[in-house]
């Protein structure tokens, strides 16, 4: 059959011809909401010019001691020392590479489709950045947000008479989360001179707090019929008298390539971490933790993404991402980890 433009138009009109193209205004891509990620929300990010180095730690006991004394006649008081020591960090380089098949890409470009399909470099760069967020959250959870990391660790129990280093789970109606957190804050203030200002909570903890009777009682008169009171992160932060509450909502697929998906929250959904940490690196403030980020190119970009061609004859090209972090616990006494909150 001799196919002409007119015959194709006639087949399209009859619905017999379906052109092999893709929609340009829709595609499905499970990129997560940026607000779900938590790795850089609790602890300050310190950009460093070397992959490893030292930093000073001044002795807490010396700084918080009263060094003043009554001056003796014709004499002087003894000089007061402030001791210090150094700790180290070491950023390890992680890498992600994605490929582009130029022959396959030719077909995709001719089929039209959305811009991301026609511009694979942009799509690969975005995917690398997205999975960098997932990787950073996994590093954070491994370094800071699980049992056995912090000296100050408490365990939730169903009993209304908790023992030492135990507390009543928030799913128990007899619990009082507001007083519990207030007591923890006061204990840290007594030991360090710093009151916790941030708290990271798992997804199930957030859900339990939002529906806890003691918290609902505090906010029930704050709304109206058209705009009922809601327990949000900001409301919880105000009730707990904290600068910020970070809800750990990011997820990842823990299954290997080719296996059935195993979706799960990255941060322990049943835990919380109460900390003191400044918003930015400081030379006269302590912090429970720091995220050291190596500026390997020296241009301020801590996630450099580059493009290069594949070997001759492969008709391929690659997009590469690099990053180097050390997520380090820097002050054990400025954090309290609570597991099994629900």
Feature names for model-found ranges:
Residues 42-49, 210-222, 278-309, 333-335:
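Surface-exposed flexible segments
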Residues 117-127, 131-133, 218-219, 234, ...:
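A binding-site-centric feature that preferentially detects glycan-recognition modules on secreted/surface proteins
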Residues 11, 105-120, 152-166, 171-175, ...:
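Intrinsically disordered, low-complexity coil segments
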Residues 1-29, 33-41, 47, 301-342:
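Protruding loop/beta-arch "assembly-hinge" segments enriched in small, turn-prone residues
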Residues 194-291:
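Extended oligomerization regions of viral-like shell subunits
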Residues 104-195, 203-221:
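Alpha-helical scaffold segments that mediate packing/assembly in large oligomeric complexes
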Residues 93-100, 317-323:
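Oligomerization/assembly interface segments of phage tail-like spikes and tubes
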Residues 32-99:
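Assembly/oligomerization interface modules of large self-assembling protein complexes
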């Amino acid at each position: 059959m001799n196919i002409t433009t007119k015959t194709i138009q006639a087949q399209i009109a009859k619905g017999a011809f379906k052109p092999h193209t893709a929609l340009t205004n829709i595609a499905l891509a499970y990129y997560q909401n940026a607000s779900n990620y938590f790795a850089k929300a609790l602890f300050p990010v310190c950009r460093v010019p070397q992959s490893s180095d030292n930093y000073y730690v001044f002795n807490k006991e010396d700084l918080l001691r009263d060094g003043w004394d009554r001056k003796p006649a014709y004499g002087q008081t003894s000089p007061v020392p402030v001791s210090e020591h150094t700790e180290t960090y070491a950023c390890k380089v992680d890498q992600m590479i994605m490929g582009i098949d130029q022959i396959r890409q030719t077909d995709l470009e001719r089929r039209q489709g959305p811009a991301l399909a026609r511009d694979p470099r942009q799509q690969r760069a975005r995917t690398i950045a997205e999975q960098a967020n997932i990787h950073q959250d996994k590093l954070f959870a491994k370094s800071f947000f699980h049992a056995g990391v912090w000296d100050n660790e408490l365990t939730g129990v169903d009993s209304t008479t908790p023992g030492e280093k135990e507390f009543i789970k928030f799913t128990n109606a007899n619990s009082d989360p507001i007083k519990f957190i207030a007591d923890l804050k006061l204990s840290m203030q007594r030991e360090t001179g710093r009151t916790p200002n941030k708290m990271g909570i798992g997804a199930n903890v957030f859900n339990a707090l939002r529906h806890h009777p003691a918290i609902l009682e505090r906010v029930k008169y704050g709304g109206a019929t058209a705009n009922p009171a809601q327990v949000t992160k900001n409301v919880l932060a105000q009730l707990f008298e904290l600068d910020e509450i970070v809800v750990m909502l990011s997820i990842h697929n823990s299954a290997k390539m080719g296996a059935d998906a195993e979706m799960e929250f990255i941060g322990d959904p049943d835990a919380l971490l109460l900390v003191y940490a400044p918003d930015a690196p400081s030379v006269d403030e302590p912090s429970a933790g720091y995220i050291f980020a190596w500026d390997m190119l020296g241009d301020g970009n801590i996630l450099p993404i580059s493009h290069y061609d594949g070997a001759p004859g492969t008709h391929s090209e690659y997009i590469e991402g690099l990053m180097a972090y050390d997520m380090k616990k820097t002050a054990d006494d400025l954090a309290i980890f609570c597991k099994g909150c629900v």
